[in-house]
């Protein structure tokens, strides 16, 4: 996690949906430089002006010390502590799919996506 991640939203937003990592975070002393925890995902969600969010990077492989089902539980706790409703995050089961509709411009045509030359 880095506060600079909010710059993505400022340059390319607003977003309808954000894929935010919530897993592979324990132990924090070791994983904090590479992986966001659920609390940090909630913080980034707020910095991105609260789009719909799909939690990613959890529940498939045991990559860290937390159990496979802990990240969504910690996410719900983090949302509750932040005073946010849980329905804005859509944790999907393995193989589950959803259809989303939105209004953000297509990335290749978005002016902020153009490379600086």
Placement of each model-derived feature along the sequence:
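Core dinuclear metal-dependent hydrolase active-site scaffold
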Residues: 1-13, 77, 93-117
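Cap/insert and terminal regions of metallo-dependent hydrolase folds
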Residues: 2-92
